[in-house]
Amino acid sequence: MGARGKTLVPLLVVVATAAMALQSTYLQVDPEKPELQEPDLLSGPCGHRTIPSRIVGGDDAELGRWPWQGSLRVWGNHLCGATLLNRRWVLTAAHCFQKDNDPFDWTVQFGELTSRPSLWNLQAYSNRYQIEDIFLSPKYSEQYPNDIALLKLSSPVTYNNFIQPICLLNSTYKFENRTDCWVTGWGAIGEDESLPSPNTLQEVQVAIINNSMCNHMYKKPDFRTNIWGDMVCAGTPEGGKDACFGDSGGPLACDQDTVWYQVGVVSWGIGCGRPNRPGVYTNISHHYNWIQSTMIRNGLLRPDPVPLLLFLTLAWASSLLRPA
């Protein structure tokens, strides 16, 4: 073998190895497994947590129990909750941006149990991500319906035991009338009671209330409003378990066969934990197509570079083997 051939063999080995490594970064989606999202929505497994097992009437959460929970921060201060959908996309409530919709002002903190990590917590800084772009639902007009927003991050999130994405479904009928779903957040623990230091993430178990019942509850005396089709209610008729101020944008999540799905986004309520005033959430399934199309239009999908890389390498190699 000539000098060209001697150079070519190790080069091809290096290129093939690099191509295999690159291909491994593109997670393959198995349609037979329910815990894997469609490839054009999420790039791999979702809804799994490492810890088995505001919020009014809640308890302190454990680190890693809700690994998709994010703290949406404006100028470094917690304002709303958020959830991680994949390495570049985050879901929250549109009304969080009523006063400031400049992406430069916003970051999302993942992997922390407190909304106020220590200044010396270098790990927290490494898990804080700048917002690149904000996408509000085109139907949102500073009113409660369509209260949903997608955030594109400026850099990809690094997954670990405490940072993982949650799953979405285009239909949440299977969660209707469930009594064992959860709301999480760093909001107030009562209408007149802020979350005390050390500002630990709170969790509370709530029941899904069908819209017909929720409308009936909200039409009782002293306040009347309508529960729209893109809303879902959760709580208890007697009150005491609810999201509160500062929980907006966070997840209402339910599990199915140990896989966790986000059913709703914390949107609004009358007070916090009042009887016959359950929390109202944006129904994820109602906006599933918008979430999907927004991600696709704005750069979620990337062409697989492996075939192109191998083709160009082989073409170049064949040119080297031609007689001089």
UniProtKB/Swiss-Prot annotation:
Residues 1-21 form the signal peptide. Testis. Residues 22-54, 299-324 form a propeptide. It is a lipid-anchor; GPI-anchor. A lipid is attached at residue 298 (GPI-anchor amidated asparagine). This is Testisin. It is found in: Cell membrane. Could regulate proteolytic events associated with testicular germ cell maturation. One of its GO terms (molecular function) is serine-type endopeptidase activity. Disulfide bonds join 46-167, 80-96, 181-254, 214-233, 244-272.
